[in-house]
Amino acid sequence: MVELNNCSNSEENGCVDSLEVRFTDFCKNGLSMGESFVTEATKLFNDSKHLLLSNNSTIGVITEGVERYWFVFVLYSVKRLSEKEVGNSSNGNEGNAFSLCQILRGAKLNVVDFFKELPQFILKVGPTLSNLYGSDWEKRLEAKELQTNFVHLSLLSKYYKRAYQELFLASGNNEDKPSATSSSAIHLPQYYRFGWLLFLSLRIHVFSRFKDLVTCTNGLVSVLAILIIHVPVRFRNFNINDSSRFVKKGDKVDLLASLGKIYQTSIDDLRETMDKVNYLITEKLKKKPCLASEFRTENLDNLDTDGLTYFEDLMEESCLPSSVSILEKDYSDAIQNKGELDERIFVNEEDSLLGSGSLSGGVVNMNGVKRKFDAMASPAKTVTSTLSPYRSPNCANSKMTVATPVSTAMTTARWLRTVIAPLQPKPSAELERFLSSCDRDVTADVIRRAQIILEAIFPSSGPAEHCAAGGSLQSTSLMDNIWAEQRTSEALKLYYRVLQTMCTAESQILNGNNLTSLLTNERFHRCMLACSAELVLATHKTVTMLFPAVLERTGITAFDLSKVIESFIRHEESLPRELRRHLNSLEERLLESMVWEKGSSMYNSLAVAKPSLAAEINRTGLLAEPMPSLDAIAMHINLSSGSLPPLPSLHKNNLAPNGQIGDIRSPKKVCSEYRSVLVERNSFTSPVKDRFLALNNIKSKFPPPALQSAFASPTRPNPGGGGETCAETAINVFFGKIVKLAAVRINGMIERLQLSQQIRETVYCLFQKILSQRTSLFFNRHIDQIILCSFYGVAKRTGADHVDIITFYNEMFIPSVKPLLVELAPAGNAEKNNHNDGQGPASPKPSPFPKLPDMSPKKVSAVHNVYVSPLRASKMDALISHSSKSYYACVGESTHAYQSPSKDLDVINNRLNGNRKLRGALNFDVDAGLVSDSIVANSLYLQNGNCRSPVAHVKTEQPES
């Protein structure tokens, strides 16, 4: 710990120099880095260390933990952003061949902590990185992509482990073969590890850029098929003749159809991926493929072998270690110079590098881990949401009945596969009728536009991009093209489908088929295409194209997209709940911050609707640039040869008035950018946030205005009459949405703080007046900042007690509590001493925070048929047994495809009220009609593995943070 407040100027310089000494020592001695790399890393460290030192202003100390985090962030940034071509280790890069995991081990930090704090480092050091590495540093750093990839791999590793344990035993079950039991300690880890390494090899050599969750799940299921075919039968944990679980083809089992049924994968996709896995085994492991139909072995008994490939000796005990070693070396060589995460840590159960945190639906939830950069934290919200535990009826009879984030994604992908994929990739006859009924036939324009825009969103690979396997494997370019073509087709069909429904609805509103002003509007069609593409990306949960990529590649702004989201949801009735939630989350994110950013087209409409604001809007340069033409986008696609970068300067402000990088320095950046990693690909939220429910309830009462006025020229009179211009109408609708969103958040704050109804109404009225009369306060800000300031201002004005938090903090709290805060700082040293001398960090210290029971202290009435409980998804599977599952409905889950949980409540009511055979006499006395707290608490504590009586500790359910 360095106490800078006790240093004089000369001493402070010594303290600063000691930081550099420790950093250099960490690089050279801790990680054995090369001299050139250390020089470059030291340059970034020296240019950014003033930001680290500035955080001591309140407490006056820098903990060793914060220092080590800064070391790691600097090294990771330099590794990713270095302009040097990193090739073979023989080219002078002997000291630079290290991965992110090696850096973390050297600093004795874990991955979860790293990702939790990384956004704060980027927020602070962004301008420095831009000066050193150019304006495209953020794209090259790929921090969001790396974090999303980590989330996906965490989910996939758990999915794989659960599936493996369901399919295979820890030891052989044939007692006639004693060697099975004696070697079980070798077989299970080796088979399990072999499968994961084979999957990682598939990701490296086949999946390339597009490592989306659905494609990777297909790869894992293909690996499971390889294991089923080759792992000795004595290790199986299933009966191949189990007709309720496996699909029969004649008198034998169709393996791929069975796996497709159990894991909700497309059989065609599974078959294609299986071919790639087989080719990978042939090329990398040098195994000779044989037609399974021509091979006789116990593993293939009762299997339909048509189309299956068998590799002799692939899983034999004598050959397996060699195969594992080959895959290990191949993976090590592939990631050696990339500075990426070593994805083998997910099957190293003894490896504590993953940390004590847990992943729930893409959100890093820390269990008792204190933020190291509290002093650096931004006012952005921490968003937590769990993935919808949707259960497919197709899996009701299988052992995979417990829904997971992965199975939820596969269920939503099934909607694309079964509802959208069968459609024609061209306008239907009904849609063509609308297109041809315009003042001129716009069918050809619509088709051409869709082709160009979707190619910009889903670019094909250039011919020069090939796999790093020396050409032995199928080129990565071809695989990328196949993926892009499939996603383009899905988005195109969805676009035509929703466009037709919208045209039908608009024609009914306008009492005519002539929709010229709408169907000839370029911005409207691009918004529809962007919305369709975003849903396809969200369904597959891609890593490389996170929102707002669709905005950048289509040339539209957040304000444009916000106009169509509600209509899109209304006009696609088959849209799964998970995708509806995704669009709701996007709309909220657009309204709360992105629409107010510099370069938003909202300012163009606002300048017309409110001329008094035009001067301020022009002075601050908030107006949007002209939307790039289709020809410009098409030319950009052709010039880029498939590797399409974002169109230059469409939405991102390059320099703020103070000369800093405005896009990074904005106080809302963490919320709008890094929140995307946790939200937009994690759109399968469950339960639905209260604000979404309330906002949707408000929306449902007011039908949306005709889309023609929403996308008309701002200065054009509104065709609906009323004397308004289209800009005034659009701004009024937009302001209405802002007010409704603010009302939901104000109400939530009031409930949490237990404030009066009068305060709620006063804050709400103040917010409305600020929006209408002081609109410029919202410019380039997050609406939560206005809401919080409104709360504080109202509290000051109404004379509430103890509200001057700023004065209290500066003048009373810190002078009194500073010694106590300083005492907390040595935790960094204690943490260091807690580590062993081994490679990874030691086990985390138990949290002093008490474990709160997941229950409400209220009595549970036996009179009511359905008890609505704030049951956490994390406790659902443990609490609900297979025998009682049919009597529960969990928010965000349904037992019927694409249906709401409310319908499940009706089903449960009917089941409870139906004719049932009572096995014994029931006591309906009043006293017996209530289930006591102790009974409920004991049941919960037993599930948690805690047998202590919790009666004295029953507390109200706390929301997950």
From Swiss-Prot:
Pfam families: DUF3452, RB_A, RB_B. InterPro entries: Cyclin-like_sf, RB_A, RB_B, RB_fam, RB_N. Residues 607-728 are annotated as: Spacer. It is found in: Nucleus. Residues 404-819 are annotated as: Pocket. Keywords: Cell cycle, Nucleus, Repressor, Transcription, Transcription regulation. One of its GO terms (cellular component) is transcription regulator complex. Residues 729-819 are annotated as: Domain B. Residues 829-856 are annotated as: Disordered. One of its GO terms (biological process) is regulation of transcription by RNA polymerase II. GO terms for molecular function: RNA polymerase II transcription regulatory region sequence-specific DNA binding. Its main location: nucleus. SMART domains: DUF3452, RB_A. Regulator of biological processes that recruits a histone deacetylase to control gene transcription. May play a role in the entry into mitosis, negatively regulating the cell proliferation. Formation of stable complexes with geminiviridae replication-associated proteins may create a cellular environment which favors viral DNA replication. Belongs to the retinoblastoma protein (RB) family. This is Retinoblastoma-related protein 1. It comes from Nicotiana tabacum (Common tobacco).
